[in-house]
């Protein structure tokens, strides 16, 4: 008997699943622990460098800080609660958390996806319109506010329709989604299916498409720039340097898009399968694997968007050396996105480049640069 109910079996006895096996639980416990520690350490270091170190306040720091904060919150609260719920298969937390966790988890996921999209758009605008102040510091802060408001608003339906459930014969308390048109015979809901499809499009489809287009446009500008420079009889070593920069930048952009797709596509696919076909004996195990992959984005994001930046690397190195070099440069707000220093050196603008040939010496001044010249 439990809480006045005559429960006669556990949920594991009533409906066994593969994730009830101790071997599977041990494997996933290790995976979740590694992701949890990696994400907390990585994003905490990013926030430390942005807040207390020598990185200037700029458009880029606003967006990267938003991404790191969202990922950190997701791993501090959402990850452990979801992991425990998957493998215990009962709700062991306070009842109010049943409603809050759905909103919190969905909101942080939306915020991360939208922030990654905004970073891609900001880079693209910076390259295509380098002489125009499109996004300044106040606008960046406002954009971040809108991202958080929109992200958590889109996640509200899960919280509204989530509630505690108990069953007479099954021991334990459960946190379940109870949509208005839920059919207990089929275990499906048309409203939940429509909402799931909307989440797939808004959280994964549109961000992946926009990011891919932005980075493709950036790559095209870089290729045009490299071809234009080659027409000036540049020295072989200068051409090699330009090619290496283009290759490095292209590699980084590919990692950004592929990392986002590989992290979130399985998670969205398994959720879509649940909405369309219901759950089966293997669903919880596959969901756990896809959830681990999605949480890996919180480990990958600090590496891609922060640590590949030489300034961040130097600050982190200084931090671990225990010196005070990180505070030598006073933080100073920058009002234009042209001051942004992206991890792949996209915004490095060379004031003057001398191109030597056998008979002539061509000097290209700063005002002779075209859109995208700061990429290489």
Swiss-Prot record:
Extracellular side: 1-29, 88-89, 161-197, 273-284
Disulfide bond is among the record's keywords: yes
Family matches, as Gene3D superfamilies: Rhodopsin 7-helix transmembrane proteins (1.20.1070.10)
A single BP term in Gene Ontology: phototransduction
Transmembrane segments: 30-50, 67-87, 90-110, 140-160, 198-218, 252-272, 285-305
Function of the protein: G-protein coupled receptor for flp-15 neuropeptides. Receptor activation assays suggest binding to predicted flp-15 peptides, GGPQGPLRF-NH2 and RGPSGPLRF-NH2. Likely involved in Gi/Go-coupled signaling pathways.
Family: Belongs to the G-protein coupled receptor 1 family.
UniProt protein name: Neuropeptide receptor 3
């Amino acid at each position: 008997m439990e809480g006045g109910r005559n429960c006669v079996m556990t949920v594991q006895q009533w409906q066994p699943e593969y994730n009830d096996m101790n071997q599977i639980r041990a494997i996933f416990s290790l995976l979740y622990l590694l992701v949890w520690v990696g994400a907390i350490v990585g994003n905490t270091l990013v926030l430390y460098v942005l807040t207390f170190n020598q990185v200037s306040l700029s458009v880029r720091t606003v967006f990267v800080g938003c991404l790191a904060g969202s990922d950190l919150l997701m791993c501090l609260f959402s990850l452990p609660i979801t992991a425990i719920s998957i493998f215990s298969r009962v709700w062991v937390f306070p009842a109010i958390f049943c409603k809050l966790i759905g909103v919190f988890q969905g909101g942080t996921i939306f915020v991360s996806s939208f922030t990654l999209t905004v970073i891609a758009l900001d880079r693209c605008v910076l390259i295509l319109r380098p002489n125009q102040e499109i996004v300044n510091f106040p606008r960046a802060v406002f954009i971040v506010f809108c991202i958080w408001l929109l992200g958590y608003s889109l996640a509200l339906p899960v919280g509204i329709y989530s509630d505690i459930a108990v069953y007479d014969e099954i021991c334990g308390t459960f946190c379940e989604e109870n949509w208005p048109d839920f059919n207990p015979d089929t275990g499906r809901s048309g409203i939940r299916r429509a909402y799931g499809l909307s989440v797939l499009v808004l959280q994964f489809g549109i961000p992946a498409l926009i990011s891919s287009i932005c980075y493709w446009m950036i790559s095209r500008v870089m290729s045009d720039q490299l071809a234009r420079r080659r027409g000036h009889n540049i020295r072989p070593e200068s051409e090699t340097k330009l090619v290496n920069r283009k290759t490095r930048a292209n590699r980084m952009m590919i990692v950004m898009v592929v990392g986002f797709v590989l992290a979130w596509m399985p998670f969205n696919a398994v959720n879509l399968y649940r909405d369309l076909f219901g759950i089966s004996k293997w669903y919880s195990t596959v969901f756990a694997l896809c959830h681990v992959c999605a949480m890996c984005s919180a480990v990958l994001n600090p590496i891609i968007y922060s640590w590949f930046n030489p300034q961040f690397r130097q600050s982190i190195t200084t931090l671990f050396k225990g010196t005070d070099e990180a505070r030598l440069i006073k933080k100073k707000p920058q009002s234009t996105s042209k001051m942004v220093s992206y991890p792949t050196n996209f915004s490095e603008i060379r004031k003057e480049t001398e191109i030597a040939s056998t008979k002539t010496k061509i000097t290209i001044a700063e005002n002779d640069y075209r859109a995208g010249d700061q990429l290489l």
